[in-house]
Amino acid sequence: SLDPKIASTLEPRAPTPERRLTAVRRLADAGIPVNVSIAPVIPAITDHEIERLVARAAEAGAQRVFFLPVRLPWEVAPLFRAWLDAHFPDRAGKVMATIQSLRGGRDNDAGFFTRMQGQGPWADLIRTRIAIACRKHDINRERVPLRRDLFRPPRGPQGELF
């Protein structure tokens, strides 16, 4: 979210939206290809910002944008419902109904091809909005080729974690 209040409610200790966009700009200015993840897209809470998020990511120098609709695996679902009731009680029912519509009527869909993108009309709408916004801002045109020539093998044996 670009809204500092929503962003801090979702991720209280994470960098602000502006700091994240500054990081995108600095990486892009240094010649590093940058992808931006718009996640989680939460119906009736963050989905209204999609076009603006794509525009700001493009302005900051991102080459690609992708999205992930909110996922509620296992223990996350009751935590999310409690968070929703605490912060957005006026929309909790609508949010959960929409999430379930893109997850086959359930809070979660662990299917390999559907868990990260969702399915159904709402997921299709978000995909279409992302695609239109990306065309408008001239991003997601092509993938950056992998530069294996930039890889430097370590000088010695790999270190140990423990």
Language-model region placement:
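Acidic-and-aromatic substrate-binding clefts and catalytic sites of carbohydrate-active enzymes
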Residues: I42-D47
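Glycine- and acidic
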Residues: A7-T9, A39, G111-M116
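Conserved dinucleotide-binding and phosphotransfer motif residues
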Residues: A30
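Auxiliary Fe-S-binding modules of radical SAM enzymes
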Residues: H48-F162
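Core AdoMet radical
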Residues: S1-V24, P33-S37, R64-L68
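Generic structural signal for hydrophobic
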Residues: V24-L27, A57
